[in-house]
Amino acid sequence: MTTFTHTRFSAAILAVAIAVAALAWSAGGAAAAVQTVNGTVGPGFTITLTMHGKKVTKLKAGKYRCVISDRSSIHDFHLSGPGLDRVLTAVDFTGTTSSSLTLKKGSYHFQCDPHASFMHGAFRVG
């Protein structure tokens, strides 16, 4: 093998290795995309959790971005489940907030603490 042929062969192997690495990285990045769930509390006495416009009843375990729209200063949004117990919006807060969550397999419950007897919901992760 001449030096010129050896150099071309090495360059071709390097190009293929870079292409394979880039493809693996982009596929891993796409698979690891963080899903967004949307919570709403208020106006009135309503509390919801949706994904893609549909009520959340079951999710896969993993990382999520949780965007809460709190439309009333008399409510909070409290989420609890395996290894998680967080008040995502406080009673005096109105506006939108975002949190990163890691959900593990199990049952989850969300509620407005001051009105927990009738403002609540649940979903499963598994």
Residue ranges and their predicted role:
Residues 67, 76-80:
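Beta-strand signatures of extracellular beta-sandwich domains
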Residues 2-14:
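Bacterial N-terminal signal peptides that target proteins for export
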Residues 25-33:
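Sec/Tat signal peptide C-region and signal peptidase I cleavage site
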Residues 82-86:
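Short edge-strand/loop segments of extracellular domains
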Residues 59-66:
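Short coil/turn motif common to extracellular beta-sandwich-like domains
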Residues 51-58:
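Short beta-strand segments of immunoglobulin-like
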Residues 33-50, 72-75, 91-126:
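Extracellular/periplasmic metallocenter environments
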Residues 13-24:
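Bacterial N-terminal signal peptides
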